[in-house]
Structures are given as structure tokens and as C-alpha cells.
Amino acid sequence: MEKMSRVTTALGGSVLTGRTMHCHLDAPANAISVCRDAAQVVVAGRSIFKIYAIEEEQFVEKLNLRVGRKPSLNLSCADVVWHQMDENLLATAATNGVVVTWNLGRPSRNKQDQLFTEHKRTVNKVCFHPTEAHVLLSGSQDGFMKCFDLRRKDSVSTFSGQSESVRDVQFSIRDYFTFASTFENGNVQLWDIRRPDRCERMFTAHNGPVFCCDWHPEDRGWLATGGRDKMVKVWDMTTHRAKEMHCVQTIASVARVKWRPECRHHLATCSMMVDHNIYVWDVRRPFVPAAMFEEHRDVTTGIAWRHPHDPSFLLSGSKDSSLCQHLFRDASQPVERANPEGLCYGLFGDLAFAAKESLVAAESGRKPYTGDRRHPIFFKRKLDPAEPFAGLASSALSVFETEPGGGGMRWFVDTAERYALAGRPLAELCDHNAKVARELGRNQVAQTWTMLRIIYCSPGLVPTANLNHSVGKGGSCGLPLMNSFNLKDMAPGLGSETRLDRSKGDARSDTVLLDSSATLITNEDNEETEGSDVPADYLLGDVEGEEDELYLLDPEHAHPEDPECVLPQEAFPLRHEIVDTPPGPEHLQDKADSPHVSGSEADVASLAPVDSSFSLLSVSHALYDSRLPPDFFGVLVRDMLHFYAEQGDVQMAVSVLIVLGERVRKDIDEQTQEHWYTSYIDLLQRFRLWNVSNEVVKLSTSRAVSCLNQASTTLHVNCSHCKRPMSSRGWVCDRCHRCASMCAVCHHVVKGLFVWCQGCSHGGHLQHIMKWLEGSSHCPAGCGHLCEYS
Amino acid sequence: TVDTSHEDMIHDAQMDYYGTRLATCSSDRSVKIFDVRNGGQILIADLRGHEGPVWQVAWAHPMYGNILASCSYDRKVIIWREENGTWEKSHEHAGHDSSVNSVCWAPHDYGLILACGSSDGAISLLTYTGEGQWEVKKINNAHTIGCNAVSWAPAVVPGSLIDHPSGQKPNYIKRFASGGCDNLIKLWKEEEDGQWKEEQKLEAHSDWVRDVAWAPSIGLPTSTIASCSQDGRVFIWTCDDASSNTWSPKLLHKFNDVVWHVSWSITANILAVSGGDNKVHTHSPWHGGHSLLVFTPPTREGT
């Protein structure tokens, strides 16, 4: 992770240059403080007290203030502060309760200046007055705060917090006489330095110790406090009662808090345990840190911004015996990592989308956070480019329908529920499904069904109202009827000699053919014209004489002894294995070289993806001409199914697979079929279409699939008379030879829903038992059992 | 538009298996569940328990009950469970050293397994072993700097289902994809000894990979993964030949901004992509990969 950028900032006169760097200290640091020239930093700890120069590339040790062979406890520092007006003046708080000042201007090696031994216990904090050169404040574990005038030998005044230890003291930057102190009991006190008798104000800021506080460098009256309750709170102290404006939740207790220069809402925090990182928060975004410095390996004990007007350099000291300079630019920014958007496809094809609302939207539309309402000016301020994000973050969550006006996946549900997959002749199934598809506005699917019907149903069996579908708009009953008559006649006329015999003569059949194709073409040309008169009239007149024969070809009237009559395989339920009997392979040979074959092939291929009723009709026409056996289309149908499956319409693939059954099964490899089945069943179950799903499982030809609903279907039944398990199949008990499924209420044999108590084996009609149980909880058979039904 | 009343940015929104409930998670540390049936939006639960921004949520398959997993910046993964209408924390996994960015449940056929990708570079796999116990496996250093996304491959059985008599658990090969800050997409496979091994490294992005999504295998003959990145590009990876396991990328689109999310429709025929422009683009990656529709969330003007 090489991220070594260099930052140079010119701050009126002085220039700050530097990069992220660190140096090893001899001992853990407890506190750091920066000289006002921003070029030196002092590090203090239990056994360290050194001044380092901050150079461009590194820290350079300049001075070790810990002199003498046997350093006294006075040198064991809990805190250190560098005077912001006098470069030579430092103060430390010793763990033995002594407050020491240091004068770097002293010529001797020992720079120690004054010693105040007034506190009884550890001094936690020292603080210089921001503008008054000689005023020093201290806060101690003994519960007292003392104000020293450095020109005098002892304290000027003592402030009693009337409570446990003082954790932090800070002079207000704006109000000359005011300072804040924080306490272990969760209180914050505000004092006037002239009135040591009692505090100006006191309030409970945190639950548990308040470890630190920091006055906002610009905003008069903003005080940030940090506590063991893992919270940082920003208070407005200008109002009569301190008002909580912001609250930031961190993941560990807050040991130090420092406002970031030039960034009004930013503050840096570090923790005294668990968490070693330093965070910079935007108080308006209390949940995600704006930046995070992860360099330290142990608890960070001191943080300080290098220059009061430069937001990019942060210095820190740590228990891991290192001193670091962090560059804001190099910080990891969890906000940047964060996904500002959430996206999810719903089941019905709707999209849920959550996106960050831009600041602009927030400005114009939304109410800002309550805390900001007081400062609407903020929104107009030009945003600091150093800020990693622009103001408030909130998200708008929208749900889109992907198909405007339609219900997304609604078609899937409708189709699944309405498709007929078995139990009727193939042609009817195809017609029904085509109709369903068309009603749902899925024309391509409808066309496919119609095509399948034409391919797989031998022409003689085409029921009426067929072309009705292929033409598209559901015309009059008369015309399509005639059309199909015509087709029926035409195909055999061309296809086989025997059928030719049955027609009235060669010439005659030719005419019919010509006429019918003319009809078809007419139909194509004006597919919208419902029942155009010309062909209808013509056909009526022409075909009249053949009606008897046509009836012979009808499934119902077919003579079994007629060798040429192709029995409707579709009449059988599809799940039965039927030997496919194509109308005769010899026809294929007859016409294999005919130009029609290649033509029709090309046609069909071209229309597989997007077909129109025009091409469809011409294809069907060609098919009848050439009398191709359905086998011929196996490959084509397979490709078609693959096409639908790839489009995500596995429903179509499976439905066709089931409807066509044996006709296509052999063309598609078992694994693919299985995959389609399982995918489709999965989908059906997601849509809670249990019945459809079950039907599909039942109808599936794949063993692996059909065994899906055979898992755990065994019921163990006891005979209601002899109470022994029934071993044989059926409802007659082997032992007592009585029917076990008698209703205990009406004493009839139960057919249909049977409910029984697992305790006493008695039961009966669901209705009867339910009624019985309304009045009594005992078994209706009178066995005395308190029946339980779940 | 759903009013979530989240107090900060929403990072993820996920619909459950039946499309009836929507779970959202936000920087405000909360996870919320809404009933969105019939166009309504009723807040069912407001789950508090994370101590940092919650990045992602994931619904488990309903056959295991109502279970939701969430992962957060606080380095924790929490598994929530509904019992008698109330949602409660059922398990907390604190095995990561950094923010956990992504969670994803394995296909239900494998049992209850959760993959979690974290900024510490590791991916952990939590497997429910019954009685409230979870077994943890960890892939250390899966992605240097961090893992941003995990996505399971659909359950596919080697060979035909037919070889396995009903009732016996078929021998699934478990796989998932992960995307990380090393600009890579990695494919992981469970070895026979139960250890996870890097199977493939897919390299095409020039910046952090933000999201990966393995397409549901409905009707598709090939394995397909969509990935998106900080570099603005969306790739569709396909593996036509499972035996050689070679994957080829196809650039679907190059956006001018970060692409945060990719999401497949349940039939895998449409890919939704959300980018830095705050819009959702839907693409049909097949047959030319043309863009279909662009959705723009309504601005909150006047509300």
C-alpha cells in the first residue's frame, strides 16, 4: 500500500510541506503537542520527553528534555502542552501530581522552569490560556482545577468540581474568562476564571466518564466532548441550556477529540482502548467516519493538527512507541468505499434501487437535519474540496417496474396457470396455449405454438379454427373453417397416391391445390380482413362435394380399418409412451429433391426468432406441399427451445417439451431437459405456483425430476379397529378384514379428504371431524381419547 | 418510491425469495424490513445491532425459515431470524479484522452457508451445523487490500441427476466468485476435503471490482458472471466449456463513472447496472448486449 503523496500548503508566510511518515520513539507516548511554528512537536510519556523537528521527509530528534541520571517522577508525563504564543514555553502534567513548566530558552541542559506541587494526585491535563501568556490551567484526578500565573510561585485560584477526578480542562478560544472541564462522572462544567467559588453551568454530557473536550476554533460556543460511552457530542454552549447538536457514535471509548482546522464540521478522535485507529468525522454524518488513519499498532494516545489553519496534517503519538504524521489525503475513507447505491431485481421483474440523494436535492426538497436547521447558511457555502463528501447523505429508495404498464413477471404467472400441458389432443393443446399467449400479448410465443401445431399435427387431423390463429386476429368462423378443409384436401392430394385416389381426379385436385394456395395468399395479403368474401364463397362452392370424405378424416369418425387414416396420437394422454407414426417416410423420399423442401427449410429457419404471420403462413403452406415428417423438424424445434431458454423463457421450453413429449425428447439431451425442468420448477415455486409446479413434475419425462414429488410421501396408517399398522395397500385391514377408512362420525367409508388422529387412529371426513371437534375434544369413535389434530 | 426513514445513506436493498419483502440497510447502522406486497410498504422490522454502517443484506432461502444476514463496517456479520413474527439476532460472527463488505447465501441445495467478504482481504464461510452452531472456514488473503463482493454459482451437479437415487444427496460442486480491490475476480471451488481453493483468476478490470453477480442458470447453457468496477466497465464473463474452465470477458458497457452494482433478473435475461450517475441501466447481455431502459429515481422535489 504505497500511498506517499506530498502536500505543501502555504499559510501566510510559512510553508508546510510533508508526507505521511512516522518515527520510532524509545518509549510509549502519552501526549503530544505542536509548537506554534508547526515545525516542532513535543512527545511526552512515562519515560520519554523529547522534541522532534518535523522535516519534509522525516522526524528529527532535536532535544531530549529528560535529563539527569535518575529521572524524577516529575518527568513522568501524563500530558504536555506547548504554548501557542511563546515558542520556548512548555508545560507538563506529571503522574505524581506535579505541574512543571519548561523554558527552552534556558542555556543549561536542564530546561525545567517551575514546579507546582499542589495537586494530590495525577494531573490529567494542562492548558495554556490562548491569549494570556502567563496563565496556565491544570485538572487533576483529585477533583480540583488550578489556575497558575507563571509569574508567581503558586496557584492563583483553585476550582473544586465537587466530584471525582477532572479529565480535561480547556480554555475557551473566544471567551477570555471561560474554560470547560470534564469529569469522570459524566458531567461537563463551565467556569468563569474570575469566580472560583462555583461553576457557571454544569450538565451531564455522557453516560460514564467524559475523557476529553475541545472548543471549536471558529464557532463560538461549540464544544465537542468525548466519553467512555463511545460517543462524541457537540454542544452549543451559547444557548441558555447546553444543547446537543450532534452526536457521533464510535466503536470504542473516546480518549481525545480535536476539531479539524478549516473544516467546520470535522473532528478527529482516537480511543484509549481496543481501537488503534484515528478517525476524522463529519459530525453531520455521525455513522461513517470521513477518514481513518490506520498506522498505529497500539492505542493512540495523543493527536494534534499540525497547524491551526491547515486541515491536511495530523500528528499522533501512540503506545506503540511511534510518532506519526498523517496526511488527510492518504487516509482511508470508508465513505469512499461505501456503496452509495443498492440494487436488486425483484421476483416480478421490478427493480429496487436505492441511491444517494445529491446535496442539491437535499437542499431543494428535504428538510436538513435538525441540527443544521439553525445554520441554513451552510448549504450555500462553497464546499471545501478537502471534504471527502458533500454534506448530508441520505438515500432515496425507488422501486421501478421494468415493464411500464405491465406487471413485470405477471405474464409468467398467468401463462403458468393457464397453459394446458396434457390431457387433450396435441392440436388442442397447441391452440389453447397459442390463445393464452396471444391474450397475454406474447405474439411470438403464440406463433410458435401455432407452428408446432402445424408441424406435428398431421394435416388430416387439423381441427377447425386452426388458421384462425396463424392469421392472427381471430376472424370469422366461416373462412378459417373452409381454409382448413381446403388444406386437408390439398395435402393428401399432393402427398400420396392413395389419397389422390380418393379425390375425384387428378385435374380436380390440381385445381383445388391452386385454388387453395390462392386462398392462402389472399389471406396473407389481407390478414386483417375478417372473412373476406371472395375465397369463402369460392371455397364453399368448390369443396362442397367432398364433405363426406372430410368427415371420414375427422378423428371421431375415422374408420379404424382405413389403412390410410392416421390415428390421432394426440388423442391419448401425452404421458403415455406412444410410438410416433409419421405419415410415412416414403413421402419424404418422394419429395426430398423437390425445391419446396429447401425452401421451406430456409423459411422456417429464418423465422425462428422473430416471425410474422406472413412467413408463418407461407411455411405452413410449403410444409403441406412437401409433407415433411415431423422428425424433420426435430433439430429446428430443439434450436427453438434453446433459443427460448436462453432468452430466459424456460417456461416455454418446458411447456413445449411436455406438450410434444416423445416427439422432441430424443433431440434434446437429457441433462439439458433436466436443467430446464428444475429451473422451471424452481421458478414456479418462487412464485408459489405449487399446483402448476406439481403438475410439471408429474408430467416430466425425466426420472430425476419426476421423483421430486415422490420424496417423503409415505403415510403410515393404523387400522382404526385393531390399531395395528396397516401393512398391505388399500384400505382394508389384513387382520380384522374391515375397512379402516370409516368415518367415525357418519360411519361411511371416506373417499377424498380423510383426517385422523394419530393417537387413536380414528378419523373421518374432514368436515365431520371439524364439526365434531367444535363440540367435543374427545374422539368421536367413543374410545375416550382426547384427539389432537394439528 | 419507498420511504425508508433511514437516517443516512442506504447501501443495499434486497427482495426476498418470494418478492414480498424488501430489506434495506444503511449507514445509520440499522437494517429495515418492509412488506412490499401489493405495492404497499409496511415496516415490519427495524433491526439494530450493528455498531457501524451496514453494507449489505442477504436473504436465505425460505426453506430454512425467515433468515436475513447483514454485514457491517463494525467487522461483524449478523444473522437475523424471524420467530413468531419477531425478528431477532440469531448469530453474530466477528471473525474479521476489518469492515465486512459483502454477504451472500449459497444455493439452498448446499444447506445454510453464508460467504462473507471483508476489507481485511479474507473471505469467511459460515456453515450452519444445527442447534444454533455455525462452523467457520476462512480463506485468508483472498484479495489483497480487500474483498468487495461475493456471489455464489447456481447449484449445478456434475453429470446427470439420474445417477443419484432419490433421497441421496447429490454431490454438488460448490463454487463462488469474489471481486476485490486487487482489480481481480476470483473463482473459488470447494475441494473434496472441504477446503476452498482458488480455481480461477479473472483479469480485465483496471480498478477495484465493486460487484460480481453470477447469473442464475435458468435455461442458460453456459456459466455467466457479470462484474462491474470502479473503472466504469461492466464485463460479462462466460465459460462455454466447463471442462477446461476458461472464461472469456465481453465488455458490456463502459460508463463514465464508477459502477456500483450489477444484478440479474431471475431468468437471467436482463442485467441491471447502477452507476455513479444515480441511474439504473438495464441491459440484455445476449444478442448484441443492447441497452434497454434507463431508470432515474424521481427527485424529491416538493415532498
From Swiss-Prot, chain A:
The modification Phosphoserine is found at S155, S470, S496, S594, S598. Component of the GATOR2 subcomplex, composed of MIOS, SEC13, SEH1L, WDR24 and WDR59. The GATOR2 complex interacts with CASTOR1 and CASTOR2; the interaction is negatively regulated by arginine. The GATOR2 complex interacts with SESN1, SESN2 and SESN3; the interaction is negatively regulated by amino acids. SESN1, SESN2 and SESN3 convey leucine availability via direct interaction with SEH1L and WDR24. Pathway: Protein modification; protein ubiquitination. One of its GO terms (molecular function) is ubiquitin protein ligase activity. One of its GO terms (cellular component) is lysosomal membrane. The modification Phosphothreonine is found at T581. Belongs to the WD repeat WDR24 family. It is found in: Lysosome membrane. The gene is WDR24. This is GATOR2 complex protein WDR24.
